[in-house]
Regions:
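Extracellular leucine-rich repeat
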Residues: 2-470
Length: 470
């Protein structure tokens, strides 16, 4: 074998090492790193200048290998330049913390029909780089989280015909043009607009997105929910609606009437004190997951929930509810599997409150003011419960609680959560002792009659002693 042939073989091996997707040598792509994945190369470049990136990526291009991930992190670029990715076959591009505020119109020209994911989060964009993205016909996911966007202009996502997921979380968006989503493909199924500055549901901009399934509007400044807003939007495919952490005070009648396939509704951490009896009209046969935690409710809104025949989860944690009434879960409770009532002010549970809960698996009653757990109240649900949490309640430990102590040590051992934190508050001898550590013969009840006669005896004894000593 001649020397020139040997050198050529060595150079070839250097550029395209063994394995289906061979990485260039570390020296060739410094300061980038390369790892081989089953579907292509994983290239990561950090703390690099533009010229260094051009040189490194040019070396990668010579391998003719597919790049599954190209990750650019902490590179001070300002602008994503043109022709940086010439000759590359990139499927997923991530450019985080690169101080990007713009993208050259030719930046994606060589990968426009290949790029499936574009992540430009944690940069400095004040405007969606629409023109640069217009030809990304294969793009499925776009992430612009944590930038400085204040408005979404008309046709902001024009040309993104394959887009399924769009995330705009953590910007400063106050205004969305009614034509913002014109030109985007009708396949868009998920939009995250959380942690912005919206004051109303952006129904008109969203009205033509007929395939939208998940809409996240949490952590905004929305104060009212109007039925006409969702009617304008359409929402015939909307499955998940997240409105948590807003400023909603009341749920009006037929608020979600047009969202007839809505399966999950999150309204936790608002200011809700009133729910109209017909608030959920129109979604009775679809709603399964409902979060109303950390609001200002003073009772379980049973009249409003009564027709939710498919409801599986009811989350009412962190409200001002003081009692569970006998019909609070009637008749909709038959399919309920998860009930969250922790961090309320519960002092009373009606003896027949849980009778209709045939499918209940999780019951959270921790951090309330319950001092007793009568057997007859909880026996209807003991066979189905998988999680039962009652810690941080002022439990009075006497004979009436003996059944619970036995259950915790036997069948309920895997069901009762934080058993060692489920402690007695009274009587004083048992204060702060875990219920499970108290024996049955210690759990006694003093009859009221005995207490009455003991008091009479003390009074008579005291009177007699006074006469004898006087």
């Amino acid at each position: 074998m001649t020397l020139p042939v040997l050198i050529a073989i060595l150079l070839t091996l250097n550029l395209c090492q063994c394995g289906r997707f061979g990485c260039p040598t570390r020296v060739q792509i410094k300061p980038c790193l390369c790892n081989e994945k089953s579907r292509g190369l994983d290239i990561s470049c950090e703390n690099a200048k533009v010229d260094q990136l051009r040189e490194a990526l040019a070396s990668v291009a010579q391998t003719k290998q597919a790049i599954w991930y190209l990750k650019l992190r902490n590179n001070h670029l300002g602008t994503l330049p043109a022709h940086l990715m010439v000759g590359l076959d990139v499927r997923h591009l991530i450019a985080l913390h690169c101080n990007l505020s713009s993208v050259d119109e030719l930046a994606f020209s060589s990968i426009a029909d290949k790029l499936e994911t574009l992540d430009l989060a944690q940069n400095s964009f004040e405007r969606v780089p629409s023109h640069a993205m217009e030809n990304l016909t294969a793009l499925v996911s776009l992430n612009l989280n944590y930038n400085r966007l204040e408005i979404l202009h008309a046709e902001a996502f024009k040309g993104l015909q394959s887009l399924l997921r769009l995330s705009l979380y953590g910007n400063r968006i106050k205004f969305i043009d009614n034509l913002a989503f014109v030109g985007v493909g009708r396949n868009l199924t998920r939009i995250n607009l959380g942690a912005n500055q919206l004051t109303a549901v952006p129904s008109r901009p969203l009205r033509n997105l007929s395939q939208l399934q998940r809409l996240q509007l949490h952590e905004n400044h929305i104060e009212a929910l109007l039925p006409e807003e969702f009617a304008i939007m359409g929402g015939e495919s909307l499955d998940v609606l997240d409105l948590a952490n807003n400023r909603v005070q009341t749920l009006p009648p037929r608020a979600f009437m047009s969202l007839q396939v809505l399966n999950s509704l999150d309204l936790e951490r608002n200011l809700i004190s009133t729910i109209h009896i017909h608030a959920f009209q129109g979604i009775e046969d679809s709603l399964e997951w409902l979060k109303l935690g950390v609001n200002r409710l003073e009772e379980i809104p049973s009249q409003s929930l009564r027709n939710l025949s498919r409801l599986r989860q009811l989350d009412l944690r962190g409200n001002n509810i003081s009692k569970v009434r006998e019909d609070d879960f009637t008749p909709y409770g038959k399919n309920l599997k998860f009930i969250y009532l922790q961090n309320n002010w519960l002092t009373t549970v009606d003896p027949i409150a849980f009778v209709s809960l045939d499918s209940l698996e999780w019951l959270h009653l921790q951090s309330n003011q319950l001092n007793t757990f009568p057997y007859e109240t909880y026996t209807p649900i003991l066979n189905t419960l998988q999680v039962f949490d009652i810690h941080d309640n002022p439990i009075h430990c006497d004979c009436k609680i003996a059944w619970l102590r036995d259950w915790v040590q036997n069948k309920g051992a895997s069901v009762v959560k934080l058993a060692q934190e489920t402690k007695c508050e009274t009587p004083e001898d048992f204060q702060n002792l875990p219920l499970a550590e108290i024996s049955n013969d210690q759990l006694i009840c003093v009859a009221k009659a005995s207490i009455h006669y003991a008091a009479i005896f003390v009074q008579v004894f005291s009177t007699t002693a006074w006469f004898l000593l006087s």
